[in-house]
Regions:
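Short catalytic/metal-binding and nucleic-acid-binding patches
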Residues: 1-152
């Protein structure tokens, strides 16, 4: 019987694409909180390449770093889930909802080649415009791109 924990393929020195859905549309404050929560492990546990927190889903691409204590890569599910849990608890406290606004499961995929990388990166970058959240992707405050002038 399926109980909600799908297996996730792992490999070293690869780029991952991850997306997860939200139980309900997130408001501006919640989207910014999730963005900050996912940026927190950047540079230590992973190298975040692009991140878009949209009202109904979140999409990101990154490379996982090795844990200094073990020499093995961090578990990507742990990184993403810890950020979701931390932000989810804060949202529950503020909204008095019973459950965090994100589903537990996420979809992840190893990016196989440069063409797939470019396709997925561009789709994430274009998502705020295609969903009519901003006139230009650069204007959407919950889109983060590595090495962009405003990336912090």
């Amino acid at each position: 019987m399926w109980r909600g924990r799908l297996p996730h393929w792992r490999a070293d020195d690869v780029t991952y694409y991850v997306t997860f859905r939200h139980r309900r549309p997130l408001d501006d404050f919640e989207r910014r909180s999730l963005l900050r929560g996912l940026l927190k492990p950047d540079g230590r546990q992973w190298e975040l390449l692009i991140l878009a927190v949209l009202p109904e889903r979140t999409e990101l691409m990154f490379k996982v770093h090795e844990a200094p204590s073990t020499g093995r890569p961090y578990e990507l599910s742990d990184i993403v889930e810890k950020a979701k849990n931390r932000v989810g608890k804060a949202i529950i406290k503020k909204s008095e909802e019973r459950w965090p606004p994100f589903y537990e499961e996420s979809y992840d995929r190893i990016v196989r080649d440069e063409a797939e990388f470019e396709e997925r990166w561009q789709a994430i970058f274009d998502a705020p415009v295609s969903e009519e959240l901003a006139e230009a992707a650069e204007d959407y405050d919950c889109l983060w791109v590595a090495d962009a002038p405003d990336a912090a």
